[in-house]
Amino acid sequence: MSGTSLAKIRNIGITAHIDAGKTTTTERILYYTGVSHKIGEVHDGNTTTDYMEQERERGITITSAAVTCEWKDHRINIIDTPGHIDFNIEVNRSLRVLDGAVFIIEGVAGVQPQSETNWRLADRYNVPRIIFINKLDRTGADFYRAFDTLKEKLDIVALPLQLPIGIEDQFVGVVDLVEMKAIVWEGGELGAKFHDEEIPADMLEKAKEYRQNLLDTALSVDDAGMEEYFEKGDVATETLKRAIKTGTISGAFRPVLCGTAFKNKGVQPLLDAVLDYLPSPVDIEGIKVAPPEGEEEDPSANRRVIPANPDAPFAGLAFKIINDKYGTLTFVRVYAGTLRSGDTVLNTTKGHKERVGRMFQMHADKREEVKEVHAGDIAAFVGLKDTGTGDTLASSDDPVVLERMAFPVPVIDISVEPKTKEAVEKMTLALQKLAGEDPSLRLKTDQETGQTILSGMGELHLDIIIDRLRREYGVEANVGAPQVAYRETITREHTETYTHKKQSGGSGQFAEVKIIFEPQERNEGILFENKVVGGAVPKEYIPAVEKGIKVQADTGVLAGFPTVDFKYTLVDGKYHDVDSSALAFEIAAKACFREGMKKAGPVILEPIMDVEITTPQDHVGDVVGDLNRRRGMIQNQESSGSTVIVRAQVPLKEMFGYISNLRSMTKGRASFTMQFHHYDPVPRNIADEIMTKSA
């Protein structure tokens, strides 16, 4: 693949708050680029990218569908991502492998909570983005008000490239500020027909004012363009587009376009903007290699960068796994090199080789087989036996490990068991496959009850998993009520010595360990330090001590919840030449943990959620009073027209079934979103309640 064709690839994501119109916009893009001959509608349940049955029924996008399409001699790989917070893992994964993103903002509500969350994720990965203010045909739509929320809530330099002509049911087109013309859509033909005309006289002054702002902002990042402007009093369209692209890629500003995807207006100029302003794989630096295993991530560290070069050794990142009727599909973003069907690559994350079977370019759930893939491509591989999400695949000539992915902590548990004994093995295999696809889903067995416990990001997330278990794997399951994923930790330092001694004829068991337990900051995890000197505990037994603590930490001393955020330091111990063994030291470490933790100020932690409620003005009192009863801490309130946005932090335990309460309290007029924020110790009375129940 030549450099020119690499410059004609765009890997983009489409992301937004739930119901802002992502999937509808993607459907229009596929229609206008010729991939689909009929436009699918979310409310009809026949969209191309929402191809899982649950998505079509619920009208939301659950998994990131990868779709390839062509526009004006360019190839665009689009990832349509979910807007519901329970599926944030999908947004995280897709932003990680994209070169650019289109953020869709609702023209009535402006920036909503999930948009803010996704925006912060895109900031983390330095993804260049353009903004599309959608649904301008809706009653109550206001381009300028929605635009103001971009500056207020995202704290960005938002740069309009278009202004709407008309609003609500009078919306007919846009003023293009780059070329200073009006683009007006004609009726019929599903929005495929539009024409240019003069800017309406009543908008000309406003258009000139916004055009001047566009020139001042865009040319501030382009010295040659600024010189051209000073010489001629204006700049060529190509110069202005070049400056806008430079500022978009650097993040100096964020271009803003507008339209209504549902009414088929504004999508073609959006596609043009994707080509004009979002980067190709060669426009950006490339991907950094990961720091060595165990070394802290340091953003300022000067790590090697892998540029997009099809002639370099192969390097790619597996970012999604899907199990379907054809087997396991592993979605890979190719960063460097060329790979052919049948080639063998090295999984450098896990240290083993994988043979690539067939490779496909995906059009939602339809596929087109390809014989080779190159730097810049996104493709699905068949035949990989043990490659997980976030694993690097590389040539053995240059076995790099690419930047690793971080996955969120599940906050909600359910127990699940098959309705028949015969289905036990079938259910276990199915859940292992589902957990392999979704790193935010955790699977474990309760040691006391033998029950299978599923941990996920929210009730909807786990609902969908159970639904998929039934539909895709034919397993009917009994599901327990959702439970909060509590954790335990310690609040003070304590040193514990424990001796394990067992003599029952023949060789016995002996091991002694002295361990200091210390609390850590939230999210620091479990840290181990070995400070044994003089061989008091032989080196070969140190891993057994580590294993004992890690295994025992899964069952906390208060109520059996996993223990987190502590450091343990092995400082001394004793061994016996004959009776000591790895098993003896593992047993001693487990018992030392049980005894030591009881004396280190153990507490139970609960997940605290960020909750945002949008309610009519006349129900604010009821909503706030109800949140207070739920142990909520009100953060702030913000009026927006006739509605009020109430932001609070509330324990997850108090939020189960909240939607039905909110609906009855506000006669169905309020809505809310919620996402995990942090873990906090539970109040004493609730801790007692939890411990009594677990006993």
From Swiss-Prot:
Q: Check the UniProt entry and state the signal peptide residues, or none.
A: none
Instruction: Report the locations given in the UniProt record.
Output: Cytoplasm
Which CDD domains is this protein grouped with?
Answer: EF-G (cd01886), EFG_III (cd16262), EFG_mtEFG1_IV (cd01434), EFG_mtEFG_C (cd03713), EFG_mtEFG_II (cd04088)
Superkingdom in the source lineage: Bacteria
User: Might you report a single GO cellular component term?
Assistant: cytoplasm
Q: Which family does it belong to?
A: Belongs to the TRAFAC class translation factor GTPase superfamily. Classic translation factor GTPase family. EF-G/EF-2 subfamily.
* Descriptive protein name: Elongation factor G
